[in-house]
């Protein structure tokens, strides 16, 4: 990631500006997934925030959102205090009567979708080298072509620090290629067969997620 003095030609890459937050947060969530740090509870927490924000936009007040989280608590182990904190997060800086939520949390999933599709695209184009540009500093995905040009001209320094999954791209490339392949294959017969045959099968060894 960007460190002070690391980009001698482009110090602006160390500063946040419009469009960078979504990609930075999306890249962070993608990193959790690709490195195996993401779990179902965390994923559900992110998706619940998006649902709660939309509920407030549609008119839900503080109490409505609190009840929404309480209803979800049985499955995701969210207690009263956490439900209140989750609700407070949605309403911070706004009004408790609804219609004016704090929408920043929506960028997590939207950013994830954009980053994921960017990764798939560069793998399909056999241009995985472009992934490392994302670690040169804070940027929007729309900036990547321009920064690639600058890098070719020696005006963009390579990133000093890379996470393991970006340093060795073999797993990422394999994963994205496989996920792209799965999207092309439609096997509804197999899916319905397994869903019917496995529905109601007892949980083994007390394992659950």
Residue ranges and their predicted role:
Residues 6-54, 111:
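Post-HExxH zinc-binding segment in Zn-dependent metallohydrolases
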Residues 42-201, 206:
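Conserved alpha-helical "signature site"
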Residues 1-5:
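Conserved small/polar residues in nucleotide/adenosyl-binding loops
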């Amino acid at each position: 990631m960007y460190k002070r003095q690391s980009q001698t030609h482009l110090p602006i890459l160390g500063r946040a500006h419009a469009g960078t937050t979504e990609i930075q947060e999306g890249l962070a969530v993608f990193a959790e997934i690709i490195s195996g740090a993401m779990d179902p509870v965390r994923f559900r927490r992110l998706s619940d925030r998006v649902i709660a924000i939309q509920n407030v936009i549609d008119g839900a007040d503080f109490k409505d959102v609190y009840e929404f989280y309480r209803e979800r608590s049985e499955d995701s182990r969210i207690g009263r205090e956490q439900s209140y904190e989750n609700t407070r997060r949605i309403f911070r800086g706004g009004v408790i009567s609804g219609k004016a939520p704090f929408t920043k949390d929506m960028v997590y999933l939207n950013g994830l979708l954009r980053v994921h599709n960017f990764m798939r695209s560069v793998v399909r184009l056999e241009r995985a080298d472009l992934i490392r540009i994302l670690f040169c500093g804070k940027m929007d995905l729309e900036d990547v072509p321009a920064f690639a040009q600058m890098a070719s001209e020696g005006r963009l320094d390579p990133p000093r620090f890379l996470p393991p999954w970006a340093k060795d791209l073999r797993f990422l490339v394999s994963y994205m290629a496989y996920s792209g392949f799965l999207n092309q294959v439609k096997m509804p017969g197999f899916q319905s067969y397994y869903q019917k045959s496995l529905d109601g099968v007892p949980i083994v060894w007390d394992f659950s997620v």
